[in-house]
Swiss-Prot record:
Substrate binds at residues 274, 331-333. It comes from Nitrobacter winogradskyi (strain ATCC 25391 / DSM 10237 / CIP 104748 / NCIMB 11846 / Nb-255). Heterotetramer of two alpha and two beta subunits. ATP binds at residues 46, 53-55, 109, 112, 117. Belongs to the succinate/malate CoA ligase beta subunit family. PANTHER family: SUCCINATE--COA LIGASE [GDP-FORMING] SUBUNIT BETA, MITOCHONDRIAL, SUCCINYL-COA SYNTHETASE BETA CHAIN. The gene is sucC. This is Succinate--CoA ligase [ADP-forming] subunit beta. GO terms for cellular component: cytosol; succinate-CoA ligase complex. Mg(2+) binds at residues 209, 223.
Length: 399
């Protein structure tokens, strides 16, 4: 689960992390009061969407002006003008895709006199089962680009969960960022604060880009992005309360209600599979034969008829889907349950695109019989390769 920048900063502030003062704004009429509260003389007006690259992004609407999603204002009138332009407009960034995202919230923040910019992040390293830190002197930039062009400028290290953060971790960060004296001590303290926040709130990723040194000689978090471990949300009602469903794909929200693992993608072939590994293999082979998957969807091993029907409805609700591939290898999941769910869903919502079904495993004969006797226009497949070729061919023929 992701949250907005202003929410992330409020959370970090609880752990003593140095963040700039700011005020969230939902309506343009609130901008003037927010700016007056902060005092100026410089303000930063920030679009709040769940995507990076806001500063370099562009709004679709001409009325929003030519500037990006993060704007520097030198007067209260400018703050008001920017708020009026940006709220309700659609911001397109490198991470939103061409559709962009509507800006429904702003964060008006006090300006900072910046001397240096750094990159700092913490994330769960699944290979080591530890929290890893990534730091770089190249702040304010795309860290993937830095890793590609100048990997020597990135320093990483992990923390043993048995000991937690120790003083040498802080010194490692200070040394990597070339911070000495009081700034080095601030860096050591910051590492402990961020680690404590990460653990206490069950975060999956914490990214600060940039972490800055002000001209007053202070470390300050200028931008913060936090993702939480969804499996741990039951322990954090306060974090769940921060969820902004308007920033999430409606199909993904619906899928979560049925405990389905669903991720919307940009392709044209909808997929329903049991097992994450098989789902990824299915997506790969669709790409191999020249088309792209419209989603990742794992119905899991214990799916019921209703759950399968819900999954099918979610796939067909995507207007980009031009064909559907169902690939089931029944172990715990029974093929006849899948078949019952698909038939029930098709009878409710109809079927206007080609459908290929590949069933193998537990109760496979019963499953094939249910589909065969349903009267549905379904293309059966013998194996995954056959299924992928058939759905790609069927979609291309319809197009």
């Amino acid at each position: 689960m992701n949250i907005h920048e202003y929410q992330a900063k409020a959370l970090l502030r609880e752990f003593g992390v140095p963040v700039s003062r700011g005020v969230p704004v939902l309506q343009a009429s609130e901008a003037e009061a927010a700016a007056e509260t902060l005092g100026g003389p410089v303000w930063v007006v920030k679009s709040q969407i769940h995507a990076g690259g806001r500063g370099k992004g562009k709004f679709k609407e001409a009325s929003a002006g030519e500037k990006g999603g993060v704007r520097l204002a030198r007067s209260i009138d400018e703050v008001k003008t920017f708020a009026g332009q940006m709220l309700g407009a659609t911001l397109v960034t490198a991470q939103t895709g061409p559709a962009g995202k509507q800006v429904n919230r702003l964060y008006i923040e006090e300006g900072s006199d910046i001397d240096k910019e750094f990159y700092f992040s913490a994330l769960v390293d699944r290979e080591t089962s530890r929290i890893s830190f990534v730091v770089s002197t190249e702040g304010g930039m795309n860290i993937e680009e830095v890793a590609h062009k100048t990997p020597e400028k990135i320093v990483t290290f992990s923390v043993d969960p048995a000991t937690g953060v120790m003083s040498h971790h802080g010194r490692t960060v200070a040394r990597a960022l070339r911070l000495r004296g009081d700034l080095g001590k601030q860096a050591e303290k910051l590492v402990t604060q961020l680690y404590d926040a990460f653990i206490a709130r069950d975060m999956a990723m914490l990214e600060i880009n940039p972490l800055v040194v002000t001209k007053q000689g202070e470390l300050r978090v200028l931008d913060a992005k936090i993702s939480f471990d969804s499996n741990a949300l039951y322990r954090h009602s306060d974090v769940v309360a921060l969820r902004d469903e308007s920033e999430e794909d409606a199909k993904e929200i619906e899928a979560s209600r049925f405990d389905l693992s669903y991720v919307a993608l940009d392709g044209q072939i909808g997929c329903m599979v049991n097992g994450a590994g098989l789902a990824m293999a299915t997506m790969d082979i669709i790409k191999l034969y020249g088309m792209a998957p419209a989603n990742f969807l794992d119905v899991g091993g214990g799916a019921t008829k209703d759950k399968v029907a819900a999954a099918f409805k979610i796939i067909t609700a995507d207007p980009n889907v031009k064909g559907i591939l169902i690939n089931i290898f029944g172990g715990i999941m029974k093929c006849d349950v899948i078949a019952d769910g698909v038939v029930a869903a098709v009878k409710q919502v109809g079927l206007n695109v080609p459908l290929v079904v590949r069933l193998e495993g537990t109760n496979v004969d019963a499953g094939k019989k249910i589909i065969r006797e349903s009267g549905l226009n379904v293309l059966p497949a013998d194996d995954l390769d056959d299924a992928a070729q058939k759905i790609v061919k069927a979609v291309k023929e319809v197009a």
